[in-house]
Amino acid sequence: MSAQAEFDAFLRFEARPLTPALGAELIGADLTRPDAQLFEEVHSALLQYKVVFFRDQSLDREQHIAFARGFGELEIHPATPADQPDPEVLRIAHGPKSRGSENNWHSDVTWRERPSLGSILRAIELPDNGGDTLFANMVVAYDRLSDAMKEKIDGLVAVHDIARVFAKRLGKAPED
């Protein structure tokens, strides 16, 4: 990236692109007091960069939910325990009793007819090493396909089925 393209200016923050294909750190945004202009600019940055990161935000659970609601109605993930006080927040923790399955390559809730815009992750405790979350820009991946491959796959439809992934968590055996 050239020195000129190091930061993209918005009115409420600066965006520092992280790679040519994906991601930007949004610097100077205060997520504890969002307003319509901040939501509009973050939404615009999200569409442009596909993944955005905010450092040094001191959001509590309620502020996290309020920020997320600024982008629309929140959905309750099927893996959320029924007795959780804030079902819109899915707690992901790893330790001796919880190994997790989200380290497998996935895209959140793609089985929905209209998947959500995205997920808003808030790291509370991170390990000294690891703890990485990986992202991919599928628009760039498609654009880089050959014309012959695009012609071959255009018009195809995929069926994403929740049953296999969540059958064990939901107390059911997956169907073959």
Which role does the model predict for each range below?
Residues 1-176:
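Non-heme Fe(II) oxygenase catalytic core, chiefly the N-lobe of the double-stranded beta-helix
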